[in-house]
């Protein structure tokens, strides 16, 4: 009975400690990891040192370290002395397993604010296909595994970091994918804290007789170095391939690597790592990358790094882009389709930015421009509008949240803006609409000039890009950036209130003047195209309509119009159901 009581008291103390933890108190300022991978047994074994800095305002007695729930902590040491730590299973969807293996470390003495501590760590386990976090939400298993494809195996070894597999230690509060954007927001907040973190990981993979290659988004050599090591199963010597990942900051780059019998194909548009049997497909991808060079040359400065494509040897996996590196299966497809797939990674190689909305939005915007070259404006807008439905849904969900009725007020509009969101729908979808609307308002030349003069190191305030666009122009864009970038005021909601048709007196050509009044019932303003349709063609007039206001546009047309349509799809709006205004035919004289 006494022993049971002692255990109960200890467990209660552990629970109280865990509940009182500040899991975001410490920032890992440096990772120095040595990673051993045995593909045959799916095993990863990691040793290394972490430098932790207390970024909270209070002294800290406890530090938390989390890795994937498929990995286990084996030891934690401070100054060559093992420290006390408690293992804890922690449910969180930042890992594909839907859980984390957490170590709650008791430090010998409090670490003051700004103080640092070096911990030597040892952990390991297996990494196998797991999509628990998706399937428990009802996602079909096959579809879930296409997205959560990370694993260690002889046929296929590839791993992404935080947000997929926590193969390096992190510390975040518990988050669930069922809670809106909570997972993305938590990861974004962690990345913000780790912007200056140094990351070094030396990766060793037992290769046996196979010719393997380790490549990733920050590997220091093209394919790795061959060597030998002891076989963990037989004790004899066995081949080993080694490569390193080095990053100066984890703010936007997620440490990712893949292992296969890769060969390298260097091309003007991109460098490809592919398996030997995929040489024909690799050449198709290289040709598709080259096909993008004209649009890239027209819109952007030369590349500051080489765009890289790494084959995922499992054909059922979904592509994954991180910066200027694309991990993707090589599949047979038409050149235009491949070009669209490759264009974002090529843009990333030419145009880095500290703002994700600029990076992601520009990548998709140039995809739209590429589609326009083949399919004109109508085809481009159809491609652009593929993000419209999820964007509208995201805005409706935000408006439905408790306390969000006054979305247009500053307190709510400052939430989830393009400057602070981690939502891919906003970053890539809304971001691409912003670039397209700016192009429609300013023209190609002005936007291209702003992109050419953009310097990521000089982008130190939110208005930097706006100022580049306004440079030498008489146009004020403050209202636009305030509605679409600095604030999240939602979307416009246009309708044609009236169209007034008047013949020009004494004009033998029978030209008529059309005045169209447009109302915007939404919370964001926009300059929107108004299409005036006549039996002999159509005329477009652009009208700037601020939120909850009306504005008019005028145009002369050669014949009485039959219909007026506000918005051709270039401006995302909450409801396009009443954008058309039918004009009754004038009675015969």
What does each model-identified segment do?
Residues 71-148, 187-191, 231, 549-558, ...:
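A surface-exposed beta-strand-loop module
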Residues 16-45, 74, 478-479, 483-484:
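N-terminal, polar/Ser/Thr-rich
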Residues 51-71, 186-206, 522-531:
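Surface-exposed beta-strand/loop patches in extracellular or lumenal glycoproteins
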């Amino acid at each position: 009975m006494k022993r049971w009581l002692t255990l109960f008291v200890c467990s209660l103390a552990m629970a109280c400690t865990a509940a009182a933890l500040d899991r975001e108190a410490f920032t890992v300022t440096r990772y120095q990891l040595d990673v051993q991978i045995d593909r045959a047994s799916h095993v990863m074994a990691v040793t290394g040192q972490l430098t932790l800095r207390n970024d909270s305002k209070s002294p800290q007695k406890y530090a938390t370290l989390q890795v994937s729930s498929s990995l286990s902590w084996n030891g934690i040491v401070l100054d060559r002395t093992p420290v006390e730590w408690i293992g804890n299973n922690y449910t969180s969807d930042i890992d594909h397993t839907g859980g984390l293996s957490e170590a709650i470390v008791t430090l010998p003495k409090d670490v003051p604010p700004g103080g640092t501590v070096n911990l030597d760590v040892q952990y390991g386990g297996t990494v196998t296909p797991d999509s628990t976090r998706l399937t428990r939400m009802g996602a079909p298993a096959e579809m879930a595994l296409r997205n959560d494809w990370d694993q260690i195996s002889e046929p296929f070894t590839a791993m992404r970091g935080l947000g997929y597999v926590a193969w390096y230690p992190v510390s975040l509060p518990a988050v669930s994918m069922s809670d809106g954007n909570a997972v993305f927001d938590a990861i974004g907040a962690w990345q913000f804290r780790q912007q200056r973190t140094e990351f070094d990981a030396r990766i060793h993979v037992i290769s046996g007789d196979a010719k393997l290659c380790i490549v990733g988004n920050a590997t220091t050599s093209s394919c790795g170095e061959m060597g030998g090591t002891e076989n963990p199963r037989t004790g004899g010597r066995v081949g080993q391939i080694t490569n390193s990942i080095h990053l100066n900051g984890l703010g936007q780059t997620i440490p990712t690597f893949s292992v296969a019998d890769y060969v390298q194909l260097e091309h003007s548009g991109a460098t490809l790592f592919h398996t030997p049997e995929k040489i024909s497909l690799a050449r198709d991808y290289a040709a598709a990358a080259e096909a993008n060079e004209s649009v890239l040359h027209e819109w952007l400065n030369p590349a500051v790094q080489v765009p890289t494509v790494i084959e995922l040897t499992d054909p059922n996996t979904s592509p994954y882009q991180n910066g200027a590196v694309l991990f993707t299966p090589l599949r047979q497809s038409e050149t235009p389709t491949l070009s669209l797939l490759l264009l974002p990674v090529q843009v990333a190689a030419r145009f880095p930015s500290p703002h994700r909305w600029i990076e992601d939005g520009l990548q998709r915007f140039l995809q739209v421009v590429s589609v326009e070259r083949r399919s004109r404006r109508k085809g481009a807008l159809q491609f652009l509008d593929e993000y419209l439905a999820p964007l509208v849904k995201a805005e409706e969900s935000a408006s439905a949240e408790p306390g969000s009725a006054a979305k247009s007020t500053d307190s709510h509009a400052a939430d989830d803006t393009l400057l602070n969101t981690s939502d891919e729908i906003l970053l890539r979808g809304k971001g691409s609409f912003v670039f397209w609307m700016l192009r429609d308002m300013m023209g190609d030349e002005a936007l291209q000039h702003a992109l050419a003069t953009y310097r990521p190191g000089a982008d130190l305030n939110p208005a930097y890009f706006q100022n580049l666009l306004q440079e030498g122009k008489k146009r004020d864009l403050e209202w636009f950036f305030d509605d679409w970038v600095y604030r999240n005021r939602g979307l416009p909601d246009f309708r044609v209130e009236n169209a007034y048709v008047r013949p020009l007196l004494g004009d033998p050509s029978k030209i008529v003047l059309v005045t169209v009044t447009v109302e915007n019932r939404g919370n964001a303003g926009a300059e929107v195209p108004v299409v005036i349709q006549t039996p002999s063609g159509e005329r477009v007039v652009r009208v700037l309509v601020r939120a909850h206001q009306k504005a008019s546009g005028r145009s002369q047309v050669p014949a009485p119009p039959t219909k007026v349509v506000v918005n051709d799809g270039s401006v995302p709006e909450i409801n396009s159901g009443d954008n058309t205004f039918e004009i009754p035919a004038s009675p015969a004289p």
